[in-house]
Curated annotation (Swiss-Prot):
Belongs to the RNA methyltransferase RlmH family. It comes from Bacillus anthracis. InterPro entries: Alpha/beta_knot_MTases, RlmH-like, tRNA_m1G_MTases_N. It is an enzyme of class 2 (transferase). PANTHER family: METHYLTRANSFERASE, RIBOSOMAL RNA LARGE SUBUNIT METHYLTRANSFERASE H. Homodimer. Its EC number is 2.1.1.177. SUPFAM superfamilies: alpha/beta knot. This is Ribosomal RNA large subunit methyltransferase H. One of its GO terms (molecular function) is rRNA (pseudouridine-N3-)-methyltransferase activity. Specifically methylates the pseudouridine at position 1915 (m3Psi1915) in 23S rRNA.
Amino acid sequence: MNISIISIGKLKEKYLKQGIAEYLKRLSAYAKVEVIELPDEKAPENLSEAEMLIVKEKEGIRILDKISDDTHVIALAIEGKQKSSEEFAVSLDRLATYGKSKVAFVIGGSLGLSSEVMKRSNESLSFSKMTLPHQLMRLVLLEQVYRAFRINRGEPYHK
């Protein structure tokens, strides 16, 4: 399985970079995983609704440019479906079973994802009803993907 994590914004925090590097190393035994960082759209504070839409649309274009037609896209969004780790593992396993060898997880910038990215997504996933920093979501997502592979192989880790 080829997994891409496409996210808006450059990661600056060293501790997050270290955690991400660790999970990428662990995941290399199970899948080809790449993290694609795309620049965020520079925007002043106190944007109007129309300006927010423009920012999301510009970031959305960058995201969509990185997704091929045969990729199964999972948008990370607060309004997405919440799953347990076991349910998430089953859904990843099903994708592999049904020949979906390319999977992209999409993480928007601080304003979220554009409507075009949401339309292109095959599903939407939420890790919590709480708002989490989009930089932190990369690490949380990689940990859950790793956990899913361990669960699916019956390997210890997930308890």
